[in-house]
């Protein structure tokens, strides 16, 4: 568990660490100023889209060969695709490396599947909640650390550092992660169709996939306009610092709450915790649209993090309980696929809403998306759920 947590932390940090200066790096590669935003968006979305499309393939291989080999494969390849960004001569090569990075990604979903397969099911919420804090902490610390390191070391040196971090992650996984897994012959691998047939509820599973996508849409739709919204609320001095602080507030509260809420889900039922977290998230997004000061927005974002701390552990625990162990990696890979699609769609939805309707409309729209998802999950749980099957 500890090594998987560290691996998730390093993976989350390595991705988020380079985001603050990606646009500047693309500008330094000679891209015209009027195309910088386009190529920056493409560099981010290309990796997420590629990861989404190939995730089911890696999931099937993980169910046959084990999750640990897939974790090692992902971290070793990303050592070169992320570290190699330090040597790109132009934006075309950068985009190629970002594409390869997405194709060979998959450390986090395989680490999740490994813990889900080996942890006692009655304690899966706590185990997966604890694991989720690794990604949260890495994603939280990454941007702050990346900006400081780029200032003192230079952008290319930061890419080399990220490659080194991922190499350490690869070695930790290779030597210290333990998995009880026996190689399965190709003819004996359960087909994906049978995995879904033997799950306890395909309807609920599909709803959980969509919920993972909605979580990312809601997060990424707000991300492009958050600093602009903060300025709209009257913050003009130290705008980047204040924006980073408000983003970090969400991650900090999520980090504090994930393990406890995962344990709470094991006690009261993860379906109940998920519904509560979705309605709570809807309420906080709606209130963010009504914020009149930066302080109010910061407090609301901090409170929203407690909802985030319950969402993914609840989804992962429910998927674990609904899925036959022989196909658990594929189910988590499909969940990752939907999550990646959300990462791609979110910024476009948020930017379009802000352009045509204003900044507050982004929060109103996001709250309605989350509310719709809450109602769908409520319908699914009331219609298809047999509580005894997921305990």
Task: Annotate each predicted stretch with a short phrase.
Residues 1, 179-208, 391:
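Juxtamembrane intracellular "pre-TM" segments in multi-pass secondary transporters
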Residues 1-24, 28, 201-219, 302:
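Pair of pore-lining "gating" transmembrane helices in MFS-fold secondary transporters
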Residues 21-37, 225-241:
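Short amphipathic helix-loop junctions that connect adjacent transmembrane helices
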Residues 42-58, 248-260:
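Central cavity-lining transmembrane alpha-helices of secondary-active solute carriers
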Residues 53-89, 265-271:
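Conserved MFS/SLC helix-loop-helix module at the cytosolic interface between two early adjacent transmembrane helices
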Residues 81, 92-100, 284, 295-303:
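Paired small-residue
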Residues 97-135, 318:
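Cytoplasmic helix-loop-helix junction between adjacent transmembrane helices
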Residues 158-175, 363-379:
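Symmetry-related core transmembrane helices of the 12-TM Major Facilitator Superfamily/SLC fold
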């Amino acid at each position: 568990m500890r090594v998987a947590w560290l691996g998730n932390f390093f993976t989350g940090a390595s991705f988020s660490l380079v985001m603050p200066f990606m646009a500047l790096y693309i500008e330094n590669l000679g891209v015209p100023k009027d195309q910088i935003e386009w190529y920056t968006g493409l560099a981010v979305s290309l990796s997420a889209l590629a990861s989404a499309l190939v995730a089911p393939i890696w999931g099937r291989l993980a169910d046959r060969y084990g999750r640990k080999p897939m974790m090692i494969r992902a971290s070793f390849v990303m050592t070169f695709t992320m570290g190699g960004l330090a040597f790109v001569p132009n934006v075309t090569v950068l985009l190629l490396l970002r594409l390869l990075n997405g194709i060979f990604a998959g450390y986090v979903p395989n680490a999740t599947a490994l813990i889900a397969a080996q942890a006692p099911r009655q304690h899966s919420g706590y185990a997966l909640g604890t694991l989720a804090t690794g990604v949260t902490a890495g994603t939280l610390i990454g941007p702050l650390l990346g900006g400081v390191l780029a200032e003192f070391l230079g952008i290319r040196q930061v890419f080399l550092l990220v490659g080194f971090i991922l190499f350490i992650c690869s070695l930790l996984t290779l030597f210290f992660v333990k998995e009880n897994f026996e190689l399965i012959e190709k003819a004996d691998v359960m087909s994906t169709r049978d995995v879904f047939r033997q799950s306890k509820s395909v309807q609920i599973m599909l709803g959980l996939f969509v919920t993972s996508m909605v979580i990312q849409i809601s997060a990424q739709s707000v991300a492009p306009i958050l600093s602009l919204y903060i300025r709209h609320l009257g913050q003009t001095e130290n705008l980047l610092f204040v924006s980073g602080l408000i983003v970090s507030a969400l991650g900090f509260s999520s980090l504090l709450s994930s393990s406890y809420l995962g344990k709470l889900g094991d006690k009261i039922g993860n379906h109940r915790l998920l519904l509560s977290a979705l309605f709570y998230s809807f309420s906080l997004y709606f209130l963010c649209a009504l914020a009149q000061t930066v302080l109010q927005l910061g407090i609301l974002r901090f409170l929203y993090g407690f909802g985030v701390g319950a969402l993914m552990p609840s989804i992962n625990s429910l998927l674990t309980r609904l899925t036959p162990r022989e196909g658990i990696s594929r189910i988590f890979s499909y969940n990752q696929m939907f999550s990646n699609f959300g990462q791609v769609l979110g910024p476009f939805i948020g930017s379009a809403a802000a352009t045509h309707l204003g900044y507050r409309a982004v929060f109103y729209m996001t709250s309605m998306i989350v509310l719709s998802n809450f109602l769908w999950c409520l319908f699914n749980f009331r219609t298809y759920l047999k509580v005894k099957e997921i305990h």
